[in-house]
Amino acid sequence: MVKSTVPTRPNKYWPGVVAIGLVSLFIFLSVSNQKHSTTSGDNIHKFSNGGTYRDGSKCITYNRNSPLAYNGSSSNNTLFWLCLLGLSMVWIAYCGYKSLSGQWHSCQHDKNERNFLFECFE
């Protein structure tokens, strides 16, 4: 017996989207959580973030690093950017899935329309 329907091609975008997301997350976290490359102290005592040491003959006080140095993890925008990255990855995967499954011809839009971002969901 001859099949009358053509099988659909499986969605192969999700591994790429996941890989790009993980690499982006790794790069973002490695840039946003930089450690200071120098440590303060002497040849015996190391204070990477400042500190105080006192013994019988020596008293050392090194200043703490600023919590805002390198625009690090003290930024309040970190969660916002991670959520935005995740939502954009879901958007790309969803549009790719819908176009491959034949539910849309493509996510094209008329440039004169105002709501072209939501055309994919109609």
Swiss-Prot record:
Keyword Membrane set for record: yes
Keyword Membrane in record: yes
Main location: host cell
GO cellular component: host cell endoplasmic reticulum membrane; host cell plasmodesma; host cytoskeleton; membrane
Transmembrane segments annotated in the record for this chain: 13-33, 77-97
Pfam family for this entry, one: Plant_vir_prot
Protein keywords: Host cell junction, Host cytoplasm, Host cytoskeleton, Host endoplasmic reticulum, Host membrane, Membrane, Transmembrane, Transmembrane helix, Transport, Viral movement protein
Entry-linked InterPro entries: Plant_vir_prot
Signal peptide start and end residues: none
Cytoplasmic side: 1-12, 98-122
Protein's cellular compartments: Host cell junction, Host plasmodesma; Host endoplasmic reticulum membrane; Host cytoplasm, Host cytoskeleton
One GO BP annotation of this record: transport of virus in host, cell to cell
Segments on the Lumenal face: 34-76
Membrane topology type: Multi-pass membrane protein
Subunit structure: Interacts with movement protein TGB3. TGB1-TGB3-TGB2 complex formation is enhanced by ATP hydrolysis.
Function field: Participates in the transport of viral genome to neighboring plant cells directly through plasmodesmata, without any budding. TGBp2 and TGBp3 are necessary for intracellular delivery of TGBp1-containing vRNPs to plasmodesmata. Can gate plasmodesmata and increase their size exclusion limit. To a lesser extent than TGB3, induces host actin cytoskeleton network thickening, which probably plays a major role in virus cell-to-cell movement.
Family the UniProt entry places it in: Belongs to the virgaviridae/benyvirus TGB2 movement protein family.
UniProt-recorded name of the protein: Movement protein TGB2
Organism: Peanut clump virus (isolate 87/TGTA2)
